């Protein structure tokens, strides 16, 4: 199968549910009234309303596909970030974690904890369909694109099979037990996200491979239950959704993952040697919520990691680049405004702590500077403004710009095997602009 055939297969899989939706006799009726006669035979414990087949599935998968295509341009930057912060890290836990959500689903059913499926048979058929579709799509993509893995071991990198498996299992778990408690869904997708991140950290996949794998996993999980609902004619299947919502602060929780560049350019002079700080690529993981007593207030927690580069310049030698991870953790507080139902605009301040780090030679060559460069921990306030658009009930996109305002303390140190001494201390402004785009997730809506 060539690349064009694989893309055609994706288009057909996305278009099939829309075609069936258009032919549905309930398509032109109000969502709250379109309930089949068979549903009346099995009245649910709480109210239900009609959800158009696969509508939200496409809204969940398509943003991830778009993000995967856009991430091709920054795959090298993310890989560089991986080597800066976890160059020697390796784990095999992702071989097990990819199946944890599905094992949880089967175990809970085995212990008699009922989910949305009325029988073991229907649940197992849903699982089998989802996993079979996942295997077919992943292998079709791997052999169609033939993309080389970042470690150079094989040309079957796109999409990530481990990530697709993990998100397919998480989606199957979510569809079976998510209506019982949203925490099951949060747990499943957290494990799936960990699996995807571990594939990047293990240097086995590019970030775009992982995003496409997540899109495939979500799509096939939803397709598995959707097809089994058609086979079993289950009135409590995909077409019906519980109206019970999480009330208060929990419902407003947003988890966002964004990538971008931080433009901080300053120079330091250490004993005739000029050290120039250059642009830093990074990623932000943020959780925010709106308190129930003041929905316009925005409070959160942000974890950021970026690659800080220092270019050492001398008159006699060419520039050498030294790198280190710039890791920060901080709180955020601000205001949020919703000009439209699906759109939001916010402004916030983020007081954070920038953790200390040691710089290493980016070229992996002997250091021509006799001294080592360290950056101390420091307080780093920042300001951000951003916009977001909710694509579906559980996913959205965002873009934000910020300005970092602080100072950083650098030490030029002479080190031996037994002692170290600070030769020079420099306190310089650590200020600059940040621009980033990313995805938002709403686990409790």
Curated annotation (Swiss-Prot):
It is found in: Periplasm. InterPro entries: P_Acid_Pase_2/haloperoxi_sf, P_Acid_Pase_2/haloperoxidase. SUPFAM superfamilies: Acid phosphatase/Vanadium-dependent haloperoxidase. GO terms for molecular function: phosphatase activity. Pfam families: PAP2. One of its GO terms (biological process) is lipopolysaccharide biosynthetic process. Residues 1-22 form the signal peptide. Pathway: Bacterial outer membrane biogenesis; LPS lipid A biosynthesis. Keywords: Hydrolase, Lipid A biosynthesis, Lipid biosynthesis, Lipid metabolism, Lipopolysaccharide biosynthesis, Periplasm, Signal, Virulence. GO terms for cellular component: membrane; periplasmic space. Disruption phenotype: No longer responds to changes in hemin, decreased removal of 1-phosphate from lipid A species. Accumulates bi-phosphorylated pentaacyl and tetraacyl 1-phosphate lipid A species. Lipopolysaccharide (LPS) from this strain is a mild inducer of the human innate immune response via Toll-like receptor 4 (TLR4) in cultured HEK293 cells; double lpxE-lpxF mutants are more potent than either single mutant. No change in resistance to the cationic antimicrobial peptide (CAMP) polymyxin B. Double lpxE-lpxF mutants accumulate multiple mono- and bi-phosphorylated lipid A species. The keyword Nucleotide-binding does not apply. The keyword Lipid biosynthesis applies. Its EC number is 3.1.-.-. When grown in low hemin conditions the major lipid A species are non-phosphorylated tetraacyl and 4'-phosphate pentaacyl lipid A, while under high hemin conditions the major lipid A species are non-phosphorylated tetraacyl and 1-phosphate tetraacyl lipid A (hemin is protoporphyrin IX containing Fe(3+) with a chloride ligand (CHEBI:50385) involved in the change from healthy to diseased gums). Removes the 1-phosphate group from lipid A species. Absence of phosphate groups in lipid A renders the bacteria resistant to host-derived cationic antimicrobial peptides (CAMP) and allowing it to camouflage itself from the host innate immune response. This is Lipid A 1-phosphatase. It comes from Porphyromonas gingivalis (strain ATCC 33277 / DSM 20709 / CIP 103683 / JCM 12257 / NCTC 11834 / 2561). The gene is lpxE.
């Amino acid at each position: 199968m060539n690349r064009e055939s694989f893309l055609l297969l994706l288009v057909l899989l996305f278009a099939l549910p829309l075609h069936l939706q258009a032919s549905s006799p309930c398509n032109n009726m109000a969502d709250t009234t379109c309930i089949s006669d068979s549903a009346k035979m099995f009245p649910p414990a709480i109210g239900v309303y009609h959800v158009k087949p696969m509508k939200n599935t496409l809204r969940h998968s398509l943003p991830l596909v778009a993000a995967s295509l856009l991430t091709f341009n920054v795959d090298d930057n993310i890989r560089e970030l991986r080597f800066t912060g976890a160059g020697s890290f390796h784990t095999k836990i992702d071989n097990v974690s990819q199946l944890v959500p599905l094992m949880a689903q089967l175990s809970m059913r085995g212990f008699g904890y009922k989910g949305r499926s009325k029988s073991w048979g229907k649940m197992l058929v849903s699982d089998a369909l989802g996993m079979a579709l996942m295997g077919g799509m992943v292998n079709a993509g791997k052999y169609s694109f033939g993309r080389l893995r970042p470690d150079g071991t094989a040309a079957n990198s796109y999409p990530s099979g481990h990530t697709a498996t993990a998100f397919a299992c998480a989606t199957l778990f979510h569809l079976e037990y998510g209506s019982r408690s949203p925490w099951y869904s949060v747990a499943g997708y957290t494990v799936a996200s960990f699996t995807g991140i571990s594939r990047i950290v293990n240097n086995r996949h590019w970030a775009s491979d992982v995003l496409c794998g997540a899109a495939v996993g979500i799509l096939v999980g939803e397709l598995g239950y959707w097809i089994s609902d058609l086979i079993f004619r289950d009135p409590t299947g995909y077409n019906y959704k519980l109206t019970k919502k999480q009330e208060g602060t929990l419902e407003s929780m947003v988890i966002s993952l964004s990538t971008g560049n931080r433009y901080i350019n300053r120079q330091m002079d250490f004993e005739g040697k000029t050290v120039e700080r250059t642009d830093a690529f990074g990623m932000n993981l943020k959780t925010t919520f709106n308190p129930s007593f003041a929905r316009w207030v925005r409070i959160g927690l942000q974890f950021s990691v970026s690659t800080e580069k220092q270019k050492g310049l001398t008159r006699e030698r060419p520039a050498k680049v030294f790198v280190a991870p710039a890791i920060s953790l901080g709180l955020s507080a601000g205001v949020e405004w919703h000009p439209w139902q699906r759109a939001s605009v916010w402004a916030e301040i983020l007081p954070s702590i920038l953790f200390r780090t040691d710089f290493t030679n980016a070229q992996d060559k002997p250091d021509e500077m006799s001294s080592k460069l360290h950056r101390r921990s420091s307080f780093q306030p920042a300001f951000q403004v951003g916009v977001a658009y909710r694509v579906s009930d559980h996913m959205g996109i965002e873009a934000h710009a910020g300005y970092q305002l602080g100072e950083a303390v650098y030490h030029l140190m002479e080190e031996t095997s037994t002692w170290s001494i600070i030769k020079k201390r420099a306190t310089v402004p650590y200020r600059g602009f940040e621009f980033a785009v990313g995805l938002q997730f709403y686990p409790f809506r």
